[in-house]
């Protein structure tokens, strides 16, 4: 499920897209693929995109892959900034959750992205209403790019994350920074 896309041979920004998924009153939503606010496979930024996933205390949302606010894919180049992911209620994300991911080439950024995950509080402290099957990142740079992952934020309550949590995660080569992340 995708809010906006710039294809591989195009140039331009993917911005201001919103994906909203809501399960009401004993309902269940199952999505067999990924959910993203905006994906840029060309030349340009992915910014100000949002994903909102919510459910009531008697319903759930299950995503079989990952959830992210904005992405510059490996075939693209540009910055990923100010994307938001909000997940509340109950359900399971089988893979990772990220506010912004930059896999593009050249010098880039993945900054000021926000992830909020808030599950229902259970009487049993070992039971979580939201399960994340992998990790949670505010913003990340992956692959061979250099750049900044700055001022990203992650907030998680009443939820279980299987792997790790990071505000900013920078795997770029060359001159990189990761600062002021929460």
Regions found by a protein language model. Give the residues of each.
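Surface-exposed loop/turn motifs in large extracellular/passenger domains
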Residues: 1-34, 39-66, 71-96, 101-164, ...
């Amino acid at each position: 499920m995708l809010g906006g896309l710039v294809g591989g041979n195009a140039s331009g920004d993917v911005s201001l897209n919103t994906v909203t998924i809501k399960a009401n009153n004993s309902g269940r939503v199952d999505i067999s693929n990924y959910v993203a606010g905006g994906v840029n496979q060309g030349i340009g930024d992915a910014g100000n995109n949002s994903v909102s996933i919510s459910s009531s205390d008697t319903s759930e949302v299950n995503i079989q892959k990952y959830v992210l606010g904005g992405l510059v894919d490996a075939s693209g180049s540009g910055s990923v900034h100010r994307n938001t992911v909000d997940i509340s209620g109950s359900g399971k994300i089988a893979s990772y959750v990220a506010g912004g991911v930059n896999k593009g080439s050249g010098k880039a950024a993945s900054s000021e992205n926000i992830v909020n995950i808030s599950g229902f509080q259970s009487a049993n402290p070992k039971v979580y209403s939201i399960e994340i099957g992998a990790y949670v990142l505010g913003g990340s740079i992956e692959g061979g790019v250099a750049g900044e992952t700055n001022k990203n934020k992650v907030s998680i309550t009443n939820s279980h994350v299987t792997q790790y949590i990071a505000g900013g995660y920078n795997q770029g080569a060359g001159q990189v920074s990761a600062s002021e992340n929460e």
